[in-house]
Structure formats: structure tokens, C-alpha cells
Amino acid sequence: MERTLAIIKPDAFAAGHAGGILARIYEEGFRVIGMKKLALSEKQAAGFYYVHEGKPFFDDLKGFMSSGPCVVMVLEADGAIRKWRDLMGATNPADAAAGTLRKEFGTSLGRNAVHGSDAPETAAFEVGYFFAGLDLL
């Protein structure tokens, strides 16, 4: 079984889509082994997205991710990283396939509803950023 980090971002949370996104996660056969609702500070958002530091969108990303509550989760499934990325859809909701979370719940490139780890190394860092080993079922 593989693990990946998933985030329901502040835009989707504020719009009341957390329940619909969680329902899809369970429907697709993921096991949620850790979940927290939290509000990130700009410093926490910067630490999480440190790989984007220096890029033109970094300040907007920090501001957005600290703009309201979000839900962070650890998902477990066979091939969890690819499976979650497929369910999320393309980064830009305008380019996302029908039936994906970003197509259904995202509104723009910067407000695309969900986040997911892109590789095993990234998943290990991201899961560890929000969860200690004892936090996971």
C-alpha cells in the first residue's frame, strides 16, 4: 500500500465542497488514515511549498493557502499517488477532464480545490510535514 498527502484547499472548503470531495475519495477506494482540519499561517504555507520559493506565484500561493481552513489527509491505496492525481485532474480546472475533482470543484489555476503529492519522495515530506507517525491509523 502506498500513501499520499491530499489537501482540500481553502477555496473548496469555504465553498462547502469538503463533504463532496471526501465522498469521492471513499468512493474511489482510498483509505483515509489521517485527517486534520487546520488553518495554515503564511509561514507554515511557505514551509510546505518551499520548492516554489522564488517563483512568481509563490507569494500568492502562500496567501491563498493561509486564507482560511483546509483539510489535510493521508490517503492509502495501491498506487495512491497516481490514483489521487488522476482523481484530482489537471492543475488548471479548465484543462481537467470531466469527472475529476478540479473540473467539478476548481474555479481557476490558483483556486483548484485540491492538492496532492507528485512522487514518493514528495509524499514522504508532505505527510511528515503535517502528521507524526502516531497520528496515522
Curated annotation (Swiss-Prot):
Predominant location of this chain?
Answer: cytoplasm
Q: What is its EC number?
A: 2.7.4.6
- Summarize where ATP binds, as residue positions: K9, F57, R85, T91, R102, N112
User: Is Nucleotide-binding included in the keywords of this UniProt record?
Assistant: yes
Instruction: Quote the InterPro entries the UniProt record gives.
Output: NDK-like_dom, NDK-like_dom_sf, Nucleoside_diP_kinase, Nucleoside_diP_kinase_AS
Report the Gene3D superfamilies cross-referenced here: Nucleoside diphosphate kinase-like domain (3.30.70.141)
Keywords (alphabetical) are: ATP-binding, Cytoplasm, Kinase, Magnesium, Metal-binding, Nucleotide metabolism, Nucleotide-binding, Phosphoprotein, Transferase
Output the Gene Ontology cellular-component terms.
Answer: cytoplasm
Task: Tell me if Transferase is a UniProt keyword of this record.
Answer: yes
Q: Which cofactor does it need?
A: Mg(2+)
Pfam families for this protein: NDK (PF00334)
- Gene Ontology molecular-function annotations: ATP binding; metal ion binding; nucleoside diphosphate kinase activity
Q: Where is the active site?
A: H115
What subcellular locations does the record give?
A: Cytoplasm
Reaction(s) catalysed (UniProt annotation) = a 2'-deoxyribonucleoside 5'-diphosphate + ATP = a 2'-deoxyribonucleoside 5'-triphosphate + ADP; a ribonucleoside 5'-diphosphate + ATP = a ribonucleoside 5'-triphosphate + ADP
Q: Name one GO biological process term.
A: GTP biosynthetic process
General function of this protein: Major role in the synthesis of nucleoside triphosphates other than ATP. The ATP gamma phosphate is transferred to the NDP beta phosphate via a ping-pong mechanism, using a phosphorylated active-site intermediate.
Which NCBIfam families does the record cross-reference, listed alphabetically? PRK00668.1
Q: How does it assemble?
A: Homotetramer.
Query: What family is this?
Result: Belongs to the NDK family.
PANTHER family, per database record: NUCLEOSIDE DIPHOSPHATE KINASE, NUCLEOSIDE DIPHOSPHATE KINASE DDB_G0292928-RELATED
Q: What is this protein called?
A: Nucleoside diphosphate kinase
Q: From which source organism is this entry? A: Syntrophotalea carbinolica (strain DSM 2380 / NBRC 103641 / GraBd1) (Pelobacter carbinolicus)
Gene transcribed to yield this protein: ndk
